[in-house]
Regions:
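Basic, Lys/Arg-enriched alpha-helical interface segments
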Residues: 1-64, 73-77, 86-109
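Conserved catalytic cores of phosphodiester-cleaving nucleases, focusing on short active-site segments
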Residues: 80
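Portal/gating segments that form or line small-molecule/metal binding sites
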Residues: 67
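Conserved Hanks-type protein kinase catalytic core
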Residues: 70
Length: 109
């Protein structure tokens, strides 16, 4: 069973592809696994925020990044929002932004 990776917008895709090299390599490696095995890679790779919102956890030499995503019925994994993490906890405003983007995406479908 194969999944597909979609992006909420061109901007989201560009932001992810402009991550520092080691974070981008980690993203490509993990999304390849997600395509083959599904979105639930488990900790430390993915985590759930509830309500169908998940995060892809990227760690590399240049730091830590997070990519929020959701899954759709048709084996689709939709990348919603990414950011470079600078604090121990995921900032509340980044979570709120990801939830809003997810709701917008669902309303557009």
């Amino acid at each position: 069973m194969s999944y597909s990776i979609l992006y909420y917008s061109k901007q989201v895709q560009e932001d992810i592809m402009n991550l520092p090299d080691t974070l981008q390599a980690r993203y490509i490696g993990l999304t390849t696994r997600m395509i083959e095995h599904g979105p639930n890679l488990g900790l430390p790779h993915t985590d759930s925020f509830g309500g169908g919102l998940f995060e892809l956890r990227l760690k590399g030499a240049e730091g830590i990044a997070r990519v929020f995503f959701c899954t759709m019925v048709e084996q689709e994994i939709v990348m919603l929002h990414s950011f470079i993490k600078k604090t121990q906890k995921t900032p509340k405003n980044e979570i709120i932004k990801a939830i809003q983007i997810k709701l917008n995406y669902e309303n557009e479908k």
